Amino acid sequence: MENNKKQGVLLVNLGTPDSATPAGVRRFLSEFLHDKRVVNLTRWLWCPILHGVILPIRAPKVAKLYQSVWMDEGSPLLVYSQRQAEKLQKKLQIPVALGMTYGNPSLKTGVEQLMDQGVEDIIVLPLYPQYSGTTTAAVSDGLTKAFKQMPVIPSYRFIRDYYAHPSYAKALAESVRSHWDKNGRADHLVCSFHGIPKRLADEGDIYPQHCEATTELLAAELGLSADDITMTYQSRFGREEWLKPYTDETLESLPSKGIKKIDIMAPAFSVDCLETLEEISDQCKETFIDAGGSDFSYITCLNDRDSHIDMMAELVALYR
């Protein structure tokens, strides 16, 4: 049946602090870590730990990290996400808005921006190629919460994941080849994905399967053997076991295996952010070099590359 309703696209990402200050970071972390999708501990146990220990200690430290990657226009995640929305709108010629699960602009703000332009049917594209309950499902939760505050809600379709879309692997491969053309090719390619607690995967989260498939599809696009590429998980915190192998431990071990030069990328991140620009580019590089590595080269996220925008347009076209 033909859809006669005016359509729009809501691009969604995780979110970012409004400022690289302890207060700004504390507000963001508080909202983020209050979500049961992120930390599903009993509230009476978790909230005192969060507000009494984690936020007072972590906010000032994380603020300094944000300051090291902050751009003139603001947070890298927000800047690149805004560029994506602008380019996608220009390509599709329909309204495109940006919403964040945590922080600003909120999901509610993004939806209202579209509805103010007469949009009645929204295609929601969470910019998480691999599904996880900690990220993608949190977007669905956030939309439901936003809709509860609206007298009239739009119809909408939800793109759950796109790790298997051919244009996604092609865009990743193109970014790798472009990096190789400019910087030369290292001995080995490391694909570092954001981790989740192993317990969540044991309970049924399909994220690790999507990450493994992504790595296999990328290797196929690049013509790499299993010996040429390694998949790891980063960003763990707390004492709980997370998905393995861990990125930092893997980087420590590679030089002893004769792998002294590596390229590293973060396929789960649609835009560069703190976890890529600071954790990978700085911390992981230091870990690898200290372990005996000689050459560490970070391959940037897809950000607002034309191939990335083209892929988004192809995804949206499936729902128009």
Swiss-Prot record:
Compartment(s): Cytoplasm
Binding of Fe cation, residues: 194, 275
BP-aspect Gene Ontology terms: heme biosynthetic process
UniProt pathway annotation: Porphyrin-containing compound metabolism; protoheme biosynthesis; protoheme from protoporphyrin-IX: step 1/1
A Pfam family hit: Ferrochelatase
UniProt keyword Iron present: yes
EC nos: 4.98.1.1
EC main group: lyase
UniProt keyword Iron-sulfur present: no
GO cellular component, one term: cytoplasm
Reactions it catalyzes: heme b + 2 H(+) = protoporphyrin IX + Fe(2+)
Family: Belongs to the ferrochelatase family.
Record-linked PANTHER family: FERROCHELATASE, FERROCHELATASE, MITOCHONDRIAL
Function noted in UniProt: Catalyzes the ferrous insertion into protoporphyrin IX.
Protein name per UniProt: Ferrochelatase
Origin organism lineage: Bacteria, Pseudomonadati, Pseudomonadota, Gammaproteobacteria, Vibrionales
Name of the gene encoding the protein in the UniProt record: hemH
